[in-house]
């Protein structure tokens, strides 16, 4: 079998680049595998493990949000007077407790504290704001512009290299 020619190599390179860009767009758009959403490659979805587990997630929405964890945490509320707390799925006590694992099912917080919040002196990073899932038109247009500019750059680079190869002539 003969070695693949330069056109086959170029086609393979272009196909691989297109697949890579498509995967990047899907991940950034939140269409990837479970646990991968907007910015998941940067955040690496290790929020609970870097912050000391599920117990650091103080709100039901943050506890069960897939952007903050791999759904290993659930919100447990064992009575109307208790505000509830975030626990790992393996630590759930099922007797007389309500378990919430979706942000839509989280109980509405009717309890408002009368105390003023005290300034924190710990060096913990702020919790990132939640972004509503859905179609982001600006990101989509930006992705299209990015892909088209990369394809145009690759086209002109390959055209330049091909033109440079054709100027060589043999002496014989």
Curated annotation (Swiss-Prot):
The UniProt similarity line reads:
Belongs to the CD164 family.
Entry protein name: CD164 sialomucin-like 2 protein
Region span, Disordered = 108-132
Supply the alphabetized keyword list: Glycoprotein, Membrane, Signal, Transmembrane, Transmembrane helix
- State which residue ranges cross the membrane: 138-158
Q: Which gene encodes it?
A: Cd164l2
Report how it sits in the membrane. Single-pass type I membrane protein
Pfam annotation, one family? MGC-24
- As given in the record, the signal peptide range reads 1-29
């Amino acid at each position: 079998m003969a070695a693949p020619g330069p056109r086959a190599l170029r086609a393979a390179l272009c196909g691989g680049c297109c697949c890579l860009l498509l995967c990047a767009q899907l991940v950034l758009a939140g269409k990837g595998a479970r646990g991968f959403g907007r910015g998941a490659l940067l955040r690496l979805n290790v929020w609970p493990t870097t912050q000391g587990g599920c117990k650091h997630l103080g709100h039901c929405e943050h506890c069960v949000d897939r952007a903050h964890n791999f759904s290993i945490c659930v919100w447990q509320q064992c009575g109307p007077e208790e505000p509830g707390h975030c626990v790992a799925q393996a630590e759930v006590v099922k007797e007389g407790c309500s378990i919430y694992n979706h942000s839509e099912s989280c109980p509405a917080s009717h309890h408002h504290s009368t105390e003023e919040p005290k300034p924190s002196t710990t060096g913990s990073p702020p919790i990132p704001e939640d972004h509503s899932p859905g179609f982001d038109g600006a990101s989509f247009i930006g992705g299209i512009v990015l892909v088209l500019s990369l394809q145009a750059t690759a086209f002109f680079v390959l055209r330049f290299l091909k033109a440079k190869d054709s100027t060589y002539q043999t002496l014989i």
